Amino acid sequence: MSNKTKLIQQIEAEQMTKEVPAFGPGDTIVVQVKVKEGSRERLQAYEGIVISKRNRGLNSAFTVRKISSGIGVERAFQTYSPLVESIEVKRRGDVRQAKIYYLRERSGKSARIKEKLAKR
């Protein structure tokens, strides 16, 4: 491994200090996002189902989908972005696929995800 690669890994490790809970596709999460309106800054909660997750160190990202006024809204977040204040897992979902894009075509009861029950 070259010095350049080691240096990049060291810098990325320094920036990845945020505590991120373990979550995956199918989980319902609440993301607290910093929103700047004019001169003030406030926190906005974005609650939805994780439909994809990309683990790439500092470049990790995840996509959250929610239904707002009957319309599906998806938003992609960078996991270690300074705009993401916190991530809270509300409910664990039991899915078999890593990317659950099939939820885009579904609505109503067919878009529901079974809850993952804790093992005894």
Swiss-Prot record:
PROSITE patterns named in the record: RIBOSOMAL_L19
GO CC, alphabetical: cytosolic large ribosomal subunit
Entry-linked SUPFAM superfamilies: Translation proteins SH3-like domain (SSF50104)
Gene3D superfamilies cross-referenced by the UniProt entry: 2.30.30.790
Record-level GO BP terms: translation
GO MF terms held by the record: structural constituent of ribosome
Keyword annotations of the record: Ribonucleoprotein, Ribosomal protein
Annotated function: This protein is located at the 30S-50S ribosomal subunit interface and may play a role in the structure and function of the aminoacyl-tRNA binding site.
Entry similarity comment: Belongs to the bacterial ribosomal protein bL19 family.
Protein name: Large ribosomal subunit protein bL19
